[in-house]
């Protein structure tokens, strides 16, 4: 199978893009021997800032010496960007081999997987084969019924900024959308929250209380911008000083606070960061 053939197969119209629900992806992964159970995860949802936050968390883990997978969507230039280990994109050869591997399983289950489910299965198999210590995994859409939510309880469930998006599927208010995204919080994990208005935060507080999952709200008040230029920003946050961020905008400082809060949570869970 060539790269063009692999991508054509993945992107076929019959894969139907993205359809909420876990039945197809769970059946596919079960047939594959459940590669999603062979890695630890940081699961990231939200409307805005997911990609930046995922990249920051993955960078922190990588610098700490962990073999770190990163699963994101969509891509900017090449499909390979969506699946990475330690900052290196999946190779064309691996895409071909893994697509050929997953294809018979995908065609054997009760209903063909969607495109996103197919890519998710390829990503999980790739991370499992390479024995990643931890994978930073970005939700495709929503949370509770997103294909990525088949993973076991993550080390941290991270909720980025909530906005009105995919309202036809997730709901027409911020609170309803928050409810869908809160579905990635599971018993046994810690939750990290981008600060929101009280009615939205209450949705996550209720979910965490029901599941006995600790909730950690990122501290935006401790952010202090020291300087900025075309090369990025330098800032203080809590006890950390002169941190450099190669991204511009106040919203990126907020995303950085979420990433740093996540790192602190992982540290408390035994990760050496």
Predicted ranges, named:
Residues 1-48, 52-67, 76-77, 93, ...:
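N-terminal leader/targeting and accessory segments in enzymes
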Residues 18, 22, 26-37, 63-152, ...:
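ATP-dependent carboxylate-amine ligase catalytic core
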Residues 18, 194, 249-252, 265:
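Hydrophobic alpha-helical scaffolding
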Residues 20, 52, 116-119, 180, ...:
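A generic structural signal for residues located within well-ordered alpha-helices
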Residues 39, 110-111, 118, 131-138, ...:
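Acidic, Mg2+-coordinating active-site environments of NTP-dependent enzymes
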Residues 68, 247-260:
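Short glycine/threonine-rich catalytic loop with a Thr-x-Gly-x-Asp
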Residues 85, 193-195, 246-247:
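Thr-Gly-centered strand-to-loop micro-motif
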Residues 107-112, 244-250:
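A short glycine/serine-rich beta->alpha loop
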């Amino acid at each position: 199978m060539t790269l063009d053939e692999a991508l054509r197969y993945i992107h076929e119209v019959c894969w139907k893009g993205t359809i909420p629900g876990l039945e197809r992806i769970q059946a596919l992964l079960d047939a594959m021997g459940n590669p999603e159970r062979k890695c630890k995860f940081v699961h990231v949802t939200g409307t805005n800032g997911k990609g930046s936050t995922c990249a920051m968390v993955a960078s922190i883990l990588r610098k700490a010496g962990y073999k770190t997978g990163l699963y994101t969507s969509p891509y900017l230039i090449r499909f390979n960007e969506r699946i990475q280990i330690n900052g290196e994109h999946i190779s064309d050869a691996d895409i071909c081999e893994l697509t050929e591997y997953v294809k018979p399983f995908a065609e054997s289950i009760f209903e063909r997987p969607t495109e996103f489910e197919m890519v998710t299965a390829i990503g999980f198999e790739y991370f499992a084969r390479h024995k990643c210590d931890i994978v930073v995994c970005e939700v495709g859409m929503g949370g509770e019924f997103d294909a990525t939510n088949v993973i076991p309880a993550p080390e941290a469930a991270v909720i980025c900024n909530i906005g009105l998006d995919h309202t036809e599927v997730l709901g027409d208010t911020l609170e309803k959308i928050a409810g869908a995204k809160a579905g990635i919080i599971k018993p046994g994990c810690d939750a990290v929250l981008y600060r929101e208005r009280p009615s939205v935060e209450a949705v996550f507080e209720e979910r965490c209380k029901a599941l006995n999952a600790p909730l950690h709200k990122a501290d935006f008040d401790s952010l202090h911008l020291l300087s900025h230029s075309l090369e990025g920003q330098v800032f203080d946050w809590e006890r950390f000083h002169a941190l450099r961020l190669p991204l511009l905008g106040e919203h990126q400082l907020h995303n950085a606070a979420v990433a740093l809060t996540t790192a602190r949570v992982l540290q408390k869970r035994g990760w050496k960061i």
